[in-house]
Amino acid sequence: MDDTLNQANPSMSRRQLLNFFTGAIVATTASAAIYPATKFFMPPAESTDAEGGILAQDKIGHPIPASQILAQASGTRALIAGLAGEPTYLTVREDGTLDPMGIVNNCTHLGCTFPWNPVDQQFQCPCHGSRYDAQGSVERGPANRPLKLVQVQVKDDYIWISPWQETDPRTGEKPWWV
């Protein structure tokens, strides 16, 4: 008499089952290690609105509430991270609102960043001495083009920065950066 059980076709042997579970554990562990490494090398997605604008951020990437800048005195120029992280000046107007025209803080001569001089009421590039007026028009070279502009909008205490597409109000022409 035969005491063995007749198994016609077992669907999976014990060894195959253990190999499957081992492979699943290795794949899960590898995925868990690769995901953060991939996220590290990918730039963070910027919050955008319907017009292609992004939220104004501070230098470490936190959104800046409009109330924080509007609490400053009129004429104050706040430096924020704008489109593509470009440093951008926002101006508080006399009526307590933000100027809808932001000025990108990159000299059109060689791309240096520069401070606003409140005494002279000018942007002064320290690299080669270019001077720009309060609206970003060239007052003294070697730069020969006005500073790049961006559109500024406040919606629900958030500041949205979007590319300037209209005619440059300083020159009356199509912007050179479009």
Curated annotation (Swiss-Prot):
Superkingdom to which the source organism belongs: Bacteria
InterPro entries: Cyt_b6_f_Rieske (IPR023960), Rieske_2Fe-2S (IPR017941), Rieske_2Fe-2S_sf (IPR036922), Rieske_Fe-S_prot (IPR014349), Rieske_Fe-S_prot_C (IPR005805), TAT_signal (IPR006311)
UniProt entry tagged with the keyword Ligase: no
Co-factor binding details: Binds 1 [2Fe-2S] cluster per subunit.
Keywords noted in UniProt: 2Fe-2S, Disulfide bond, Electron transport, Iron, Iron-sulfur, Membrane, Metal-binding, Thylakoid, Translocase, Transmembrane, Transmembrane helix, Transport
Key word Cell membrane present: no
Enzyme class (EC, first level): translocase
Chief subcellular location: membrane
Record's subcellular location: Cellular thylakoid membrane
GO molecular function: 2 iron, 2 sulfur cluster binding; electron transporter, transferring electrons within cytochrome b6/f complex of photosystem II activity; metal ion binding; monooxygenase activity; oxidoreductase activity, acting on paired donors, with incorporation or reduction of molecular oxygen; plastoquinol--plastocyanin reductase activity
Family classification: Belongs to the Rieske iron-sulfur protein family.
Protein name in the entry: Cytochrome b6-f complex iron-sulfur subunit 2
Organism: Nostoc sp. (strain PCC 7120 / SAG 25.82 / UTEX 2576)
